[in-house]
């Protein structure tokens, strides 16, 4: 029997986000959710490489903590992984806006990041984080204040440090999305915006990017292209996430002008 959060994939897709559902997600959970009151943000503190290396642990749990450990995972490339439609063990003891039953009333999002300065958050991932949270809060009809970080919820204060970014700024971005002020990032006047490219993309823009990087121009963003993109990003001191967004396009334009 499916649990209650079967609306999650459609809500995220409606916000223009990339979504992958995991096998068995509809019936996965430690019982059903209560009334969904908000969203709790986490980071995985996992490996330095890979798009979503902690997916298995989040899905199946650890020896000391039964899974699922959140309803959603968020990869470094901005992909949402729908893991569970039921309750997950992500919150623990704490309090936010009067809610003390985090596992029952908050949807958990585990975003892939080590949570240290050496692992900066990719722009594409942070944009997806804000948009995904806004999509969920809009669906349940509450404001941005009902998004909290694990570090804000957990008691005693200081028990948790995730997520590593500033939650006040994050909520401001979510609030802007909810009010329609910031539905999508706007390019500067005179810019010619180009879409974000990631593994799986195909077409003329992929060929253009491959030419800039000295790669065979087959127009397919596969693993070899991703590896070259990561190496270029690292050389340019950008987040080496293998995703070509606004900053990477600007760096490519500057390097190969």
Model-derived segments and their meaning:
Residues 176-223:
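Acidic, Ser/Thr/Pro/Gly-enriched interdomain connector segments
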Residues 206-209, 221, 232, 238, ...:
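Fold-core signature of tandem repeat domains
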Residues 73, 108-110, 216:
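Conserved beta-strand segments that form the floor/walls of ligand-binding pockets within enzyme
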Residues 1-20, 28-33, 100, 107, ...:
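Basic/polar, cationic surfaces and motifs that engage anionic cell-wall
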Residues 75-77, 218, 241:
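Acidic/polar residues in short coil/turn loops that connect beta-strands
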Residues 1-102:
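N-terminal catalytic cores of peptidoglycan-degrading enzymes
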